[in-house]
A protein has these predicted regions:
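Residues that mark the start of a beta-strand
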Residues: 2, 26-28, 161
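Short Gly/Pro-enriched turn/cap motifs at secondary-structure boundaries
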Residues: 7, 18-19, 51-57, 107-111
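Glycine-rich beta-strand-centered segment in the early N-terminal region that forms part
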Residues: 20-34, 47-91, 130-132
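Cysteine-cluster motifs in flexible loop/terminal segments that predominantly coordinate metals
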Residues: 37, 72-73, 82-127, 131
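Cytochrome P450 core scaffold surrounding the K-helix E-X-X-R motif
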Residues: 39-45
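Mid-domain Rossmann-like dinucleotide-binding core that forms the NAD(H)/NADP(H) cofactor-binding site
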Residues: 133-186
Length: 186
């Protein structure tokens, strides 16, 4: 399969690599679309990802194959995934704070990502998509979830005035979420 592999500062190469083999708890996904995140751009400019890994974590695709212990998915399901892969066993995971996981893996940053024809991920970070959501639009699920999380953590209330710094994808999604949530002056 073809994949975009990060080698360092301003060094990403399209190469042919083997389709990943899955373990019993993993899902093999045929990637339909993969976005390029601001973190990918920063890594390209600075070289701060792990060399030799396939990049990409904002993606959508179709389940191609499931491991023997996978129960929630079948071949043909439309899916996306959380780019954070917590261990589920450390003190942070057990206290409901998986983003602080001591053993956190990150798709496309510490393990192979989705800017490829296929990606494999553990079942617990894969999510089914509704039929009415296109695979193209589903590439925005990751940035949208970050925005929703940030707004939910804030003290925002309808009618509040808000300041959004930055007009990239996250800023624009934040604008839409706040408008639809009843923000006053933006």
């Amino acid at each position: 399969m073809k994949a975009a592999i990060f080698y360092g500062k301003e060094d990403v190469r399209i190469e042919n690599v083997e389709v990943p083999e899955i373990k019993s708890n993993e899902v093999l996904i045929k990637v339909a679309y993969c976005g390029i995140c601001g973190s990918d751009v920063t890594a390209f400019k600075t070289g701060n990802y792990v060399s030799g890994l396939i990049i990409g974590h904002e993606f959508s695709g179709i389940v191609e194959k499931v491991g023997t212990n996978v129960r929630k998915f079948k071949k043909g399901d439309k899916v996306t995934a959380n780019g954070y892969i917590p261990c589920g066993q450390c003190k942070y995971c057990l206290s409901g704070k998986p983003s602080l996981c001591d053993n956190l893996e990150m798709t496309g940053i510490t393990i192979n990502g989705a800017l490829a024809e296929y990606v494999k991920l553990p079942e617990h970070v894969v999510y089914k998509l509704p039929d009415e959501l296109s695979l193209l639009h589903a590439t925005l699920v990751d940035p949208l979830s970050n925005v929703l999380h940030a707004v939910n953590l804030s003290d925002f209330k309808p009618g509040n005035s808000v300041l959004i710094q930055g007009a990239g994808p996250i800023g624009l999604i934040t604008l839409e979420v706040l408008k639809r949530s009843g923000a006053g002056k933006i």
